[in-house]
């Protein structure tokens, strides 16, 4: 009951996220299960040497990363709320999920992203919006759509690279990439670091990236 009792104590979100993986899902209410599952997955992402995010995520125990713990946990939590986003989310009554399948998709997708956007990878979020909460959110929201369009149910890195490569010319994660262009229906342009990690900022960039992917994949021959 530690987690429930301390929600009202204003503990730092990153500390709460780091505590959740140690709590069995059977001891957590339904409303909190997405957060607990996401925290468990994120723990694998920063601890596993095979993960594309290995040693890149800051936690209360490790401060050498470039990504905020909450910035990566929140989009995963959002995806988990809809079981259609992950094949491995067919849960049993005991709340058991196929962690390995979910991690496989996350690993492959983000390994591909690290190759396609190598210039924006593993650098401070002040230098790369891809490592910022708003960029992580947008790319995680795109992930189910990319996987759905791939030939394999659990696509490999190379196939995902082909898909992400289609949107690469339209993504402006760093200063060298220039401004984001025609972000909305009014032709809005935004500086490379102009998207804020707010609800409106995340919605705007997510809609832009999803719309761009929809348009380029429609005309692509893969």
Residue ranges and their predicted role:
Residues 1-222:
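Accessory terminal alpha-helical modules
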